[in-house]
């Protein structure tokens, strides 16, 4: 942690020969944070995730399981639900990331509520910006309404899932989107983890 007169100023993390300075992460989140006491924890989590992403994209860390990246515009609804279902339904057999081409400040409250109905808590999640490294480190990239925002790398599997956008929608409108995402994620996991014959 980098501390200054105003408290925590940033985080410097090193791993696998890769360094990331997240001073900008704290500065970006601080004005929006309602509970600043936990801000260093959120920034540290994002730094760890970014370090692993960069290390895998550069081939410094071997992948143990298939990796999926879910991308939507705001990373506040569809991609968050898809990532959460992937974590839950795969039981750790798949590594998952989510990102947005223009991330929102927070997760959509109706999405958070709809996922709680499924026993999945998104309160610790935050919208993240789409990076080239995240795409490069992934085996499968699923986009949802973000057009051509994703860079294309050879050898990656790309799919675009046409789903309604839950932004500014109530829980009643979010539930069918959630259920369709769950169905698609279940099918994707089964396909990825199916033993080769």
Question: Can you describe what each PLM-predicted range is?
Answer:
Residues 1-18, 24, 34-39, 53-63:
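Basic, alpha-helical nucleic-acid-binding regions used in initiation and control of genome expression
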Residues 17-32, 44-48:
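Amphipathic alpha-helical segments that form the core helices of the histone-fold
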Residues 24, 41, 45-49, 84, ...:
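Short, residue-level hotspots on alpha-helical faces of the histone-fold
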Residues 53-132:
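Conserved active-site segments centered on acidic
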Residues 76, 146-149:
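Short glycine-rich anion-binding loops that position phosphate/pyrophosphate groups of nucleotides
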Residues 138:
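An anion/phosphate-binding loop that grips the pyrophosphate of nucleotide cofactors and donors
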Residues 150-197:
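Phosphate-binding/catalytic loops
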